[in-house]
Each structure stands twice: as structure tokens, then as C-alpha cells.
Amino acid sequence: QLLTPEIVFRLTQLHEYKGRLNRLLETDAAALSEIKETAALQTVAASNRMEGITVAEDRLKKLILNKTNPQTDDEKKVAGYRDVLTSISANYDFLPPAPSTILQLHRDLYKFSGKTVGGNYKDTAGEPCAESLASLCNAFEQALQDPVLDPLLLIPMFMVDFLNIAPFDNGTERMSRLLLALLLYRSGYEVGQYSSIDAILLNTKASYDAALQRSSHNWAAGTNDYAPFTAYLLNTLVTAYKSFDEIATRLTAKGLSKPDRVRDIIKLHQGEITKSEILKQCPDISQITVQRALADLLNNKHITKIGGGRYTSYIWNGEN
């Protein structure tokens, strides 16, 4: 029932993309490292926006880059998410998907809030959630030991179960996305470090909600269908890998002119991008060359300028 033609096709695609990313990391790791910061920025911003957590753009960027201290409740949530994502990216091999790990990550998610909500199950006694989460983690780990079972099928199922268990009063949805990153990285699918999966989830939130609802129907009775959410998540990963593939091709291309590289950076970037972010992605291109390329793109109406001064950003005009 789970192995529909669409899902089988997506699995094949993702296995191929995984191999390509691994090969590029072996040959062009330095070039690819330039886009990790941008992906992290997009991930933290998108995941928190999905939960209605709003922070002014200038403050958001400083918070994500750890260049200011959080002040409001929303800023503290952003800072907590930033730190947990950073920890997962750096230490995923040492973070098994166990209840103790999940509780620790949830505690860290709220470490700036000064509240006891972090690291505690939602019900007073804690037992029902604790038992359900322990059973889920044990079943997942056992399934991973079976070489016949593809982690890309197990991970969406884990997410559906986790979201239906809903072990926390606050932060369950954000934790689910952090756990998605953790499980993907541990399974060798590191695309989220170079292309923001959360940004794609945000842009397709209606489809996300619909797929999750369909796969959650009759969950308590144990007769739910995991296929809708599995197909959705695999499609999301394919989109992320395609975006990464385009960026990697551009970064490792030898024949493109510098203005064309600036153009492609903006075109392939999801959302707004600043001049400083462009410069970080292309350290061999001078600031003057980037400024000239931006002016030319503006004159030809390929991009739109947003804001001014230090916080000026640019976005690609979709019709071009």
C-alpha cells in the first residue's frame, strides 16, 4: 500500500541525488560550504514562521547569526531553534532518536524562555506520552536494522506518529521538523544543510497540512494510511535536492561569467537575499562587480529591490 508508483519513483530519484551530493562533497566541499549559512538562515526563519512566530527582518537575521541577544518571547523561540538546529547539524551522529535525546532537544528549544515547559511531557504524570514516545523510538530503531526497509519510508512514518502522539504542550511541530533534519542526516541525506527543507514546507503548507491530515485519519485505531504524507515528504525532498543541484552546478561551473553567477544566485535563492549573502556565496567576486551586476539586473527588471541602507535585499521577479 505504501509503495505506490509515485513513491517508488521518488525513492529512485532521491537515491541518485544522495550519491551526487556525496560526490560533490568529496570534490567541491569548499565551494558548497558557502551556501550552508544561507540554508540555515532560511530554515530557522521558515520553521518559526510556520508557527506564527514573527520577528522583524533585521532582528531575525542577527538572531540567527547569533549577533544579538533575544529580547521578546518570539525572539527567544527563534534563538532556541537556532541553537538546536546548529547542534543537530554538528553532532547528529551522536544524537540517537531516543526519548532522552528528544527531551534534551526540547529543553534546549526553550532554554532562553526561562520556563519549565522545555523538556517536559504535556500531561502531568508524563506516563502516556513517555510510553508512546519510547515505543515509537524503539520501533523506529528496530526497523532501521532491517536492510530491506528504506529509511526514506520510515522517516515520514515517524513524523506522522510523533505529531499524533504530540508529546509536548508547546513546540511539538517545531520539534518534528528538527527531528526530520536529525533523522535525514543520520540516514545520509544531508541536503537540508545546503537547501532549506523548511522553506519548502512553508511554501507548500496547505499541501503539508492536507497530507498530514489524510495520513492521520484513523491513526488512533492503527488503520491510518501513511502514503499521502510519505509522498508529500518525498516530493519535498526531491524539490530540495533539485534546488541544491542547481546551486551546486552554478557554484562549481567554470564557464559562467561573474555577472551571470550573481544573476543565478538571486534566481535560485528562495526569497530575499542581501548583497553580503551574495558575496559570501562567491568570495572570488569583488563587491564592485556584484554592485554592477545588481544595477544591471534592476535596470532590466529581472530583480526587485526591497528596503534600503544596511538592510537592502533583492528578490527575483518570477515572470523573468
Each PLM stretch: what is its role?
Residues 1-320:
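FIC/Doc superfamily catalytic core
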